[in-house]
């Protein structure tokens, strides 16, 4: 995130605006071709009115405890990308958050003040419902999937495997493994993100992911953290 604190984030964005700085928030997943296709087909109305959004985001292995201690926690460090993706796809603001989670992978993560497994339910202003699940450890690889369900159908963005070859033999069919690192999965999105930002600078245009997108994601993440600690839904008031 831009910062772990909303007030400091707001002041940062005010300074950026005051000084005329080109500013793009690093939500690289918006530049992933699969997720862009998902957004495009939603906007074309291929599945009608949106009803339910489901996002799965699971890392292959937890980061070092030294990182966990300064990360801001799973909602601000990891799930914040999914909060932004939810806004990107639904094109509406989250008004209610309910979070549940626990320490199921490594007790050292809990001792560092964080959790390693979480599920969040979102309610949007337009009535769309969303769920996001995060895990710090999926033993089978980097698991990144999205499903959007609507009045006229459903669209899924499945995992991107290391190649498209499937081995079939006497022991069955065997798919290639999933990427084991986020840079492997999202390499092209990082490149596209940088190219698009350079174009904004060269052509003096507005970046695709602006400061307010970062602010809104932080707001949702902080609400999720509060919900987890309080064990109740948290309402989000959009006054920023």
Question: What annotation goes with each model-predicted range?
Answer:
Residues 108-114, 125-192, 210:
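NAD(P)-dinucleotide binding in Rossmann-like oxidoreductases
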Residues 65-129, 135-140, 212:
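Rossmann-like dinucleotide-binding domain that binds NAD(P)(H)
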Residues 13-22, 36-50, 149-150:
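Basic phosphate/pyrophosphate-binding loop/patch that engages nucleotide-derived ligands
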Residues 22-24, 54, 98, 131, ...:
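Structural detector of well-ordered beta-strand residues that form the stable sheet scaffold
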Residues 9, 35, 82-83, 191-195, ...:
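A general structural signal for well-ordered alpha-helical segments in protein cores
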Residues 52-55, 189-196:
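Generic alpha-helical secondary structure signal
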Residues 8-13, 18, 125, 197-240:
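C-terminal helix-rich "cap/oligomerization" subdomain common to oxidoreductases
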Residues 1-30, 45:
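Beta-strand-loop-alpha-helix segment that lines the small-molecule cofactor/substrate pocket
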